């Protein structure tokens, strides 16, 4: 009955304790610890202590910190966590590694605070799993932003006036290397793009970022992008060739040329880059041979008759380009020439003013005394009449008169024809043809005899100013007699020549300034700036697209560069808040604060600013003036002392100070004091081997800042550091083993432990305890033995149990050590074994909970221990070779060598991947060597290229070599005088003269002659491909070409 009463009472006690309010069970939260990182995502921790035996909830909570992206680009923690070992699987927060030596797998957790990807929310890694981060910054928090941007709100406090757009100081990322370039069509982030400022919607009062929909009713600010540096990626560079020029010469075999560029295309813009970036590709030919089939030549017809019957006239002929349309205008034969009729024109017949009656009247002449003063009569022909036929052959006529001239008045006098009968009479009729008759197919007039002929006139303007255009010769119909242009209908359409054109302006286009459209204005008010791209470019192809132009350096354009910016939105702005730069952090390490000034300012239409009273700006949008800053943990001091402490085997508890090294027995309880003065000791924290210590039943930091370790184990060995606002000192603990004898129950009186505050003590009567104890000892009920040994410390109960003390024995049952397990080299392995607690009473042995042995003051043996440590392989380098015998690399400088291998301490060689490749010693090193001198070496002169005459040439080989070894020395002879590699033939006796050949006889009267004394080299190499060679060695090349056939 009393036993049942006891059980009911215990259950009632547990039920009452479970209803204690958490606020009374927990102490206040500690201050936040410093962030585990300074950038890239870390965590900060906060602790609270349970004041009662039963507390619900967590004793530690975490928040994210240092979320700013690190400036220096580093590899992801998931990629480096295995420390060079093989990565078997890579989770977001856990990575499985495999030892390259043993093949064993082991699990590593990613650092807490490392960002990870959750389904819908922001998340970070915590304790090996991806945990949601609440809007309050706490990991695993259930707080979220509501529709109004309030953290943990209910969506009923929206005020759109509180939310504004804000241009952050962060920009979108530029491509930092060629692997980041994801789109070469211009749509993605590519080579020389721009970086945009990030615009976010924020709560104007708190400054927190909120969903963008809360700023949907406000105009999003226009931002000004900044250009990204251009990346030149050799793997994406290519050769680009311009269009070919026309074949030169225009008839027969010749050459044509084109420009070849190394380019890189981005955003539909082709940029000219140095040729070295295209070395992996095949460079297109810049020159090639060609054959032009358009070989026009001039042909001239017969001269026409002289147009004058006396004095000087004109003769004309037809000149045409046949066999093509590219005849050289400079070599065009003359189409007109002067001619002489053979009879001087002493009288201007066109001015004769006839008056037959007056001058033939005898009375007129009769009055003159001297008839001898008259000139002798002569026949004078008049102008030809028009042709009797408008087309085809006709007749034209003229009159012939006998006249004389009075030498005094110079007036002509018409005489009877009989006065001139002794003179030869000129023709009175002549055949003529105005034009060919179109319907008269059987016309026998040649083209040269036609009165109207087709002629080519001046060239039209070139169709292009560069890169090769076309121009045409204007076709005209000319009246042969006058040389004037008439309508085309006057010329024979059947004889109309083909259209004639020629290439023109084949030179490259000059560089020019290529401009884009202006961007949007950088300011919505207050005089902003619009920008555009202005680049020096050159057109290299007539095709459209990115390959039509290449971008050059600005100094290649000789005209004034157009402006890249222009002023826009010249209107005044309303008053707004302006912030100054943040001050320096108040602390150089750990957490501090920094401040900045904030004032109200207006910007006028000209862009000038003026401070205004704060009341003119919106107080709800005023930026913060103070914020927290952190620059990582404070620097470490050196070890405070070199004290060495060795524990005495009789000691069970020890108190140590900071400094030195202590070697202790396992199982010892330790207290280490932190020498902090004038500091809040509740804020003291400890680290073991660089990792912050978390309180538990085995190890904890007390309220006064001291570190306590209960029943120390072998794995507790390490370096312990004490921190306030900086490192105060450290101590190194090592442990050694001791024997583990069986422990008997100590039933001696012990001082009563005072009860904890708010904890009730269960009262048990003497008779109940004796009855329960007798049942336990006789029936060996393990559960009741545990209840007896953990019962309240009642003096009367202990007196009743004292008589059984010698018969109740508790001891540890210890198993065998396992094989040594070692995850990786340079880290000690470990061995494990099983332990269990056994109680012996009246000869009977039972396995019981381990807590029974521990409660009997028996030291618990360690379940693990360190084992042999296998060192990592290391680099071993041999001695350097002698510099004097090594290969020369430049003048007075050689390169010595040595072997570098990866070996274990026992001398075993392994693959180099097992050693740290970043610390591999150099295998080569430059060293001074006086023997490293280069010189030109020549071979003997070769035989003469000619067996006769004086134009022969001798050749020899040149090579730059090291004097000491005779090996090739590359370009190390460039500063020395280069010996001649060719000379005119030198012989003891002059060579006999060459016999004339058919080729020589053929060229004897021609202008094709050799102009260089080295033309005989062509006979050795049979190379006349170059136009310059053919011009300077015309005779030799003719001989070579004839010899081929």
From Swiss-Prot:
Disulfide bonds join 35-65, 39-70, 50-55, 674-722. PROSITE patterns: IG_LIKE, PLAC, TSP1. It is found in: Cell projection, Axon; Secreted; Synapse; Secreted, Extracellular space, Extracellular matrix. Disruption phenotype: Disrupts the clustering of the cholinergic receptor subunits unc-29, unc-38 and acr-16 and the GABAergic receptor subunit unc-49 at postsynaptic domains of neuromuscular junctions (NMJs), and the receptors are redistributed to extrasynaptic areas. Loss of neuroligin receptor nlg-1 and netrin receptor unc-40 localization to NMJs. Isoform a and isoform c: Defects in AChR localization to cholinergic synapses. Decreased AChR-dependent currents triggered by motoneuron stimulation. Isoform b: Extensive dorsal muscle arm extension defects and weaker ventral muscle arm extension defects. One of its GO terms (molecular function) is signaling receptor binding. Keywords: Cell projection, Disulfide bond, Extracellular matrix, Glycoprotein, Immunoglobulin domain, Repeat, Secreted, Signal, Synapse. Residues 1-23 form the signal peptide. Residues 24-71, 236-292, 294-510, 512-572, 576-635, 811-873, 932-990 form the TSP type-1 domain. Pfam families: Ig_3, TSP1_ADAMTS, TSP_1. The keyword Disulfide bond applies. Isoform a: Expressed in the commissural GABAergic and cholinergic motor neurons in the first larval stage but only in the cholinergic motor neurons in later larval stages and in adult animals. At the L1 larval stage, mainly localized at the nerve ring and at the dorsal cord. Isoform b: Expressed in the commissural GABAergic and cholinergic motor neurons whose cell bodies reside in the ventral nerve cord and which extend axons into the ventral and dorsal nerve cord. One of its GO terms (biological process) is extracellular matrix organization. Residues 1004-1041 form the PLAC domain. Glycans are attached at residues 268, 280, 730, 781, 899, 906. Component of an extracellular matrix cue that is involved in the guidance of dorsoventral midline migrations and in the specification of postsynaptic domains at neuromuscular junctions (NMJs). Acts as a ligand for the netrin receptor unc-40 and the neuroligin receptor nlg-1. Secreted by the dorsal and ventral nerve cords to attract sensory axons and muscle membrane extensions called muscle arms. In parallel with unc-6 and slt-1, involved in the netrin receptor unc-40 dependent guidance of the AVM and PVM mechanosensory axons along the dorsal-ventral axis. The Ig-like C2-type domain is required for the attraction of the muscle arm extensions. PANTHER family: ADAMTS A DISINTEGRIN AND METALLOPROTEASE WITH THROMBOSPONDIN MOTIFS PROTEASE (PTHR13723), PROTEIN MADD-4 (PTHR13723:SF305). Interacts with eva-1 (via the SUEL-type lectin domain). Interacts with unc-5. Interacts with unc-40; the interaction is required for the localization of unc-40 to postsynaptic domains. Isoform a forms homodimers and heterodimers with isoform b. Isoform b forms homodimers and heterodimers with isoform a. Isoform b interacts with nlg-1 (via extracellular domain); the interaction is required for nlg-1 localization to postsynaptic domains. Isoform b interacts (via the Ig-like C2-type domain) with nrx-1 (via C-terminus). This is Protein madd-4.
């Amino acid at each position: 009955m009393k036993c049942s009463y006891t059980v009911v009472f215990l259950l009632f006690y547990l039920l009452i304790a479970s209803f204690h309010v958490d606020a009374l069970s927990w102490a206040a939260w500690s201050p936040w610890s410093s962030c585990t990182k300074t950038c890239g995502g870390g965590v900060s921790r906060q602790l609270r202590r349970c004041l009662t035996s039963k507390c619900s909830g967590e004793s530690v909570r975490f928040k994210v910190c240092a979320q700013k992206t690190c400036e220096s680009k580093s590899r992801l923690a998931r990629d480096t966590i295995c420390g060079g070992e093989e990565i078997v699987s890579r989770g977001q927060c856990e990575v499985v590694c495999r030892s390259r030596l043993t093949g064993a797998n082991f699990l590593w957790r990613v650092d807490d605070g490392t960002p990870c990807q959750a389904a819908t929310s922001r998340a970070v890694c915590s304790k090996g799993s991806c945990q949601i981060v609440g809007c309050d910054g706490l990991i695993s928090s259930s707080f979220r932003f509501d529709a109004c941007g309030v953290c943990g709100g209910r969506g009923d406090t929206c005020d759109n006036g509180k939310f504004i757009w804000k241009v952050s100081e962060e920009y979108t990322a530029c491509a930092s290397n060629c692997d980041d370039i994801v789109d070469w069509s211009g749509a993605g982030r590519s080579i020389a793009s721009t970086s945009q400022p990030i615009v976010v919607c924020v709560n104007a009062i708190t400054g927190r970022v909120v969903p963008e929909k809360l700023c949907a009713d406000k105009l999003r600010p226009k931002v000004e992008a900044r250009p990204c540096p251009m990346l030149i990626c050799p793997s994406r560079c290519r050769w680009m060739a311009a269009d070919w020029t026309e074949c030169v010469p225009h008839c027969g075999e010749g050459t044509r040329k084109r420009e070849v560029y190394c380019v890189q295309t981005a955003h539909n813009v082709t940029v000219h880059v140095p040729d070295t970036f295209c070395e992996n590709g095949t460079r297109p030919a810049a020159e090639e041979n060609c054959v032009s089939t358009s070989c026009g030549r001039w042909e001239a017809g017969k001269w026409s008759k002289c147009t004058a019957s006396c004095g000087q006239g004109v003769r004309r002929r037809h000149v045409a380009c046949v066999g093509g349309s590219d005849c050289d205008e400079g070599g065009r034969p003359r189409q007109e020439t002067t001619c002489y009729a053979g009879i001087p024109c002493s009288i201007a017949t066109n001015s004769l003013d006839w008056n037959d009656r007056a001058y033939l009247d005898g009375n007129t002449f009769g009055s003159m005394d001297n008839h001898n003063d008259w000139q002798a009569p002569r026949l004078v022909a008049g102008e030809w009449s028009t042709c009797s036929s408008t087309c085809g052959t006709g007749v034209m006529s003229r009159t012939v008169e006998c006249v004389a001239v009075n030498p005094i008045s110079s007036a002509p006098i018409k005489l009877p024809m009989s006065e001139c009968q002794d003179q030869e009479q000129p023709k009175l009729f002549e055949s003529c043809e105005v034009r060919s008759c179109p319907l008269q197919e059987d016309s026998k007039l040649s083209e040269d005899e036609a009165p109207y002929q087709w002629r080519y006139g001046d060239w039209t303007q070139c169709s292009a100013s560069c890169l090769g255009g076309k121009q045409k010769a204007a076709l005209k119909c000319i009246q042969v007699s006058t040389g004037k242009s008439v309508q085309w209908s006057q010329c024979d359409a059947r004889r109309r020549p083909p259209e004639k054109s020629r290439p023109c302006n084949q030179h490259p286009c000059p560089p020019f300034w290529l401009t884009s459209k202006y961007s949007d204005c950088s300011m919505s008010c207050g005089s902003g700036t619009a920008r555009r791209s202005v680049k020096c470019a050159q057109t290299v192809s007539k095709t459209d697209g990115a390959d039509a132009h290449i971008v050059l350096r600005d100094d290649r354009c000789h005209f004034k560069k157009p402006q890249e910016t222009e002023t826009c939105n010249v209107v005044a702005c309303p008053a707004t808040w302006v912030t100054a730069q943040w001050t320096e952090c108040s602390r150089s390490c750990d957490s501090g604060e920094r401040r900045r000034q904030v004032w109200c300012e207006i910007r006028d239409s000209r862009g000038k600013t003026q401070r205004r009273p704060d009341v003119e700006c919106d107080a709800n949008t005023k930026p913060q003036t103070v914020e927290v800053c952190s620059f990582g943990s404070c620097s470490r001091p050196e070890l405070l002392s070199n004290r060495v402490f060795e524990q005495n085997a009789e000691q069970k508890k020890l108190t140590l100070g900071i400094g030195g090294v202590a070697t202790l027995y396992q199982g010892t309880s330790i207290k280490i004091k932190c020498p902090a003065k004038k500091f809040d000791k509740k804020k003291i924290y400890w680290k073991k081997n660089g990792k912050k210590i978390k309180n538990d039943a085995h190890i904890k930091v007390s309220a006064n800042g001291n570190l306590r370790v209960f029943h120390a184990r072998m794995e507790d060995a390490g370096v312990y550091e004490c921190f306030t606002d900086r490192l105060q000192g450290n101590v190194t603990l090592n442990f050694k083993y001791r024997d583990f004898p069986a422990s008997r129950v100590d039933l001696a009186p012990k001082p009563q432990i005072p009860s904890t505050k708010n904890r009730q003590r269960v009262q048990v009567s003497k008779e109940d305890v004796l009855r329960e104890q007798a049942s336990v000892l006789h029936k060996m009920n393990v559960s009741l033995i545990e209840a007896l040994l953990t019962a309240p410390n009642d003096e009367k109960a202990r007196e009743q149990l004292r008589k059984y003390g010698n018969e109740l024995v508790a001891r540890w049952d210890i198993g065998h050590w396992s094989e040594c397990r070692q995850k990786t080299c340079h880290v000690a392995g470990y061995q494990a074994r099983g332990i269990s607690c056994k109680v012996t009473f009246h000869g009977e042995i039972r396995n019981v909970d381990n807590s029974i042995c521990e409660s009997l003051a028996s030291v618990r043996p360690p379940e693990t221990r360190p084992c042999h440590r296998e060192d990592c392989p290391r680099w071993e380098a041999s001695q350097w070779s002698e510099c004097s015998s090594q290969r020369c690399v430049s003048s007075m400088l050689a390169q010595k060598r040595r072997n570098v291998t990866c070996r274990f301490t026992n001398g075993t060689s392994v693959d180099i991947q097992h050693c740290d490749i970043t610390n591999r010693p150099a295998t080569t090193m430059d060293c001074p060597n006086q023997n490293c001198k280069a010189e030109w070496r020549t071979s003997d002169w070769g035989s003469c290229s000619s067996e006769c005459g004086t134009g022969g040439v001798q050749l020899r080989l040149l090579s730059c070599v090291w004097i000491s070894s005779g090996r090739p020395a590359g370009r190390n002879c460039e500063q020395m005088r280069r010996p001649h590699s060719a000379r005119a033939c030198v012989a003891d006796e002059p060579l006999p003269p060459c016999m004339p050949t058919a080729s020589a006889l053929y060229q004897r009267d021609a202008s094709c002659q050799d102009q260089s004394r080295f033309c005989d080299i062509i006979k050795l190499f049979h190379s006349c491909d170059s136009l310059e060679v053919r011009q300077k060695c015309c005779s030799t090349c003719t001989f070579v070409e004839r010899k081929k056939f």
